[in-house]
Amino acid sequence: VMTLLMLDSGMRLGECSALLVEDLELSRRRINLRAEETKGRVARTVFFGEKTERVLRRWLQFKDRYTESDYLFPVRESGGHIQVSNFEGNFKKYLTRCGLNEAYTPHCLRNNFAKRCLMNGMDIYTLSKLLGHSSVTVTEKAYLDLTDDDISRRYQSHSPISFL
């Protein structure tokens, strides 16, 4: 559930792991990130899609059967939230089990989110706000590493001659 949520919202792992249930606005498909949990110490709002909403609703039903923790992703024994290092270790373990490259990290989900948003036509200003960057320049430096294949696909849907 955390993996899906990070991929669909662009949140950092630390932001996602510290979420409280009250940070969610399921009906509006949004999450209000508290300033103390963001890298830049500035509150922001992120969003998620319909599929993620359905998964989150099921997760909440499951979670509530096992713990009364206020955290969205609690550790059952303590009621605290899952620690970043524990999630990273499990993430790496599951990559290995699936035969995937262990070089992937949870932050790759954020990178993938940003790249897919750009490839799907989102403007860089909106993306920068969603990612919580202090400026568009930060977003450009971090996420504009498109491959030739990426550029080719984008070009084909925007070719000036194709639309004459």
Q: What spans do the regions from the language model cover?
A:
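Catalytic-site neighborhood detector that most strongly recognizes the C-terminal catalytic loop/helix
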Residues: 37, 131-156
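Catalytic tyrosine of NAD(P)H-dependent dehydrogenase/reductases that use a Tyr as the general acid/base
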Residues: 103-107
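Key DNA-contacting residues within the recognition helix of helix-turn-helix
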Residues: 17, 88, 139-140
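Active-site/catalytic core of tyrosine-dependent DNA strand-transfer enzymes
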Residues: 49-101
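C-terminal secondary-structure termini that scaffold catalytic or DNA-interacting sites
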Residues: 158-164
